């Protein structure tokens, strides 16, 4: 970031980091946003999705799908509000489509090709507007 100029820098936390380490997530989000702006770029939060409903990963995490989605949504939106940043809310779109389209890879955590396409479309829309 220091050696090149960027228009935007996309910030994505580990899948459950905004929930399991919320204070650290918010603190580091602020620091990163400051550094990004110092270099003339705009930070953008890439808000991720809950683990696949009914999947083993979600079961072992100890939350239901709605709860994980809500906590991720709240953490990412709080970080975006506090830091006055753009947000590419991919997690919200995954949630809206959860009972209509399979967006997950076999691990129930990462996106499949369709999920990746939707994520790319949302990010592009945020950056273009």
Positions of predicted regions on the chain:
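Alpha-helical cap/lid subdomain in secreted, periplasmic
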Residues: 1-113, 117
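Extended, basic/helix-rich recognition subdomains
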Residues: 111-129
